[in-house]
């Protein structure tokens, strides 16, 4: 789970499944081909290829309605097109035809999760555990649903069960860290992230999250070091630049904050928190200049701040 710092919000986003939440809130059939291609990062030609495959699988099912694999593959294609209702229908038909079809149960559970249907997702994953009690993905995604619904103790249990089965999965330690963080157990959160990094030193999300934990603990230099490592792994990691900007703000180094936040926005103009954080940096730069009797640009800083906050609100859909 990523943790992105901002003044007005703290975005907690789990990155490890196919579609982002902002995408999952829309159904693909409501978008034009061009809009859909932009949303899901595919070319229009790729979408047309998916459409052709959908036609083929529909023909297969028409001739053999009891082909569970065809329903499953059609569900995947609908999911790629963001036609989630259709995807759910196909996955449901797949598991009805083949009750021990684990991949279909898991895919169905993940679509439920993306639509915030957490109870349905958990029920589906529990069916997987009845088939295979050692299924790591089922424990992991049940824990994820528990976490998203605030059932932290239950989430902790599921993530630990997953780790008992697969102890070398760095993502699991990040999930576990998220629970500890939400419980306010920051030392334990940091310890889990260090385990993830020990397994995979190039795991940029773990470095990002560890920087966040250090920031919350007031360990600003340590936080900055983790963000620098994350950027060293991925120089285009906009979230790390954004978080680094608030560390500079905390140190009252607003010029540096503004520069690094502009870098984050240059990499990803649609990153809401980077705009929000830049607005915070502009606002405080104006206050700093006022305190230093250098307030000739005070109104300009405020205008810049409000412009960034307006962009931020637009990106998150706030009015």
Region annotations inferred by a language model:
Residues 68-69, 102-103, 136-137, 170-171, ...:
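Helix-start (N-cap) detector for alpha-helical repeat units in TPR-like alpha-solenoids
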């Amino acid at each position: 789970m990523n943790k992105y710092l901002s003044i007005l919000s703290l975005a907690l986003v789990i990155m490890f499944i196919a579609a982002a939440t902002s995408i999952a809130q829309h159904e693909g059939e409501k978008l034009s081909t061009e809009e859909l291609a932009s949303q899901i990062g595919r070319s229009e030609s790729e979408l047309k290829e998916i459409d052709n495959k959908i036609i083929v699988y529909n023909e297969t099912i028409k001739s053999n309605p009891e082909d569970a694999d065809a329903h499953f593959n059609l569900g995947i294609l609908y999911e790629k097109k963001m036609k989630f209702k259709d995807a759910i229908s196909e996955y449901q038909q797949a598991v009805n035809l083949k009750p021990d079809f684990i991949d279909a149960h898991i895919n169905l559970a993940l679509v439920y999760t993306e639509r915030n249907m957490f109870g349905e997702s958990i029920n589906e994953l529990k069916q997987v555990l009845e088939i295979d009690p050692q299924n790591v993905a089922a424990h992991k995604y049940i824990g994820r649903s528990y976490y998203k619904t605030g059932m932290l103790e239950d989430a902790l249990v599921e993530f630990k069960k997953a780790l008992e089965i697969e102890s070398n999965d760095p993502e699991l330690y990040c999930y576990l860290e998220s629970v500890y963080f939400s419980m306010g157990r920051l030392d334990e959160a940091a310890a889990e992230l260090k385990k993830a990094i020990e397994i995979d030193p190039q795991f940029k999300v773990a470095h990002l999250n560890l920087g966040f934990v250090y920031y919350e603990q007031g360990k600003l230099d340590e936080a900055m070091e983790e963000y620098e490592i994350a950027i060293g792994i991925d120089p285009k990691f906009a979230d790390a630049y954004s978080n680094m900007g608030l560390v500079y703000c905390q140190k009252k180094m607003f010029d540096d904050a503004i520069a690094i936040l502009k870098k984050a926005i240059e990499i990803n103009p649609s990153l809401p928190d980077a705009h929000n954080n830049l607005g915070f940096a502009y606002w405080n730069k104006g206050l700093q200049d006022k305190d230093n009797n250098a307030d000739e640009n005070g109104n300009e800083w405020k205008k810049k701040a409000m412009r960034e906050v307006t962009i931020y609100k637009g990106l998150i859909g706030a009015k």
